[in-house]
A protein has these predicted regions:
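Conserved residues at beta->alpha junctions
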Residues: 9, 103-106, 163
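Short glycine/serine/threonine/alanine-rich loop segments
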Residues: 36, 65, 99, 154, ...
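N-terminal helical cap/lid subdomain that shapes the substrate entry/recognition surface
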Residues: 1-88, 110
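Asp-based, Mg2+/Mn2+-dependent phosphohydrolase catalytic module
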Residues: 1, 91, 95, 108-208
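Hydrophobic, well-structured mid-protein blocks that either form specific transmembrane helices
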Residues: 74, 78-105, 115-116
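Hydrophobic residues in well-ordered beta-strands that form the structural core
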Residues: 13, 103-105, 181
Length: 208
């Protein structure tokens, strides 16, 4: 059994502090390197995120931005790590899940590794796949999912994707993975979602 985890808003709550800071850094980067004002930079950032699943993809495709330079300057660990909120239930959950656990994130590798360490759960993961490891093709692109399955020689039917993004799970389901949507308070469950959970710790119930 293979458990594939997203990072932000799945293993930790990124929306309160981490995401707003990253968004500000991305906007500042666009202002400096594309020479546009703040309103235009915000529009571009949001447009590319909506269209491609990551602002970076649009900047690379349409403006020739160096992806590594962008990721390094928009994910400063000295600013972001103090904003990461830890939850002991996450480690408790990972300990009780049988099989391998890996990370598949649209974040850069240095950020993923640092956040897992900050959360105290890095030892649970046998592999980590950040954007650099999947050729900068972010979810919901199928490339990242296929890369994980191929490199780990895992079967889709024996693999589980745990995500807060329904769009990403749509791709995972199309590829044959089992899908778990972490969506607190969400009443609906789309056909491509096998399980909808309010809390990550509810995963343990799926293997009892």
């Amino acid at each position: 059994m293979l458990w594939i985890f997203d990072l932000d808003n799945t293993l930790h709550h990124a929306s309160p502090g981490v995401f707003p800071h990253i968004n500000r850094m991305m906007t500042d980067y666009i202002i400096r390197h594309l020479h546009v004002d703040e309103d235009a930079a915000n529009r571009l950032r949001q447009h590319y995120w909506t269209r491609y699943g990551a602002t970076l993809t649009g900047l690379v495709r349409h403006h020739g931005v160096d992806p590594r330079h962008f990721l390094r300057h928009t994910h400063p660990l000295e600013d972001l790590l103090p904003l990461v909120e830890t939850d002991p239930q996450v480690a408790w959950t990972l300990t009780r899940l049988p099989g391998r656990k890996v990370l598949l994130s649209n974040g850069p590798a240095h950020y993923c590794a640092a956040v897992l360490t900050r959360l105290g759960i890095d030892r649970h993961f046998s592999a980590q796949f950040g954007l650099e490891h999947i050729r900068f093709a972010p979810k919901p692109s199928p490339h990242g999912f296929r890369a994980v399955l191929s490199r780990l020689r895992a079967r889709p039917g024996q693999s589980w994707m745990i995500e807060d993004s329904a769009d990403n799970l749509k791709t995972a389901k199309r590829l044959g993975l089992n899908t778990v949507w972490l969506a607190p308070g969400e009443p609906r469950r789309p056909a491509y979602v096998d399980h909808r959970l309010n809390r990550l710790s509810d995963l343990v119930r799926l293997v009892r």
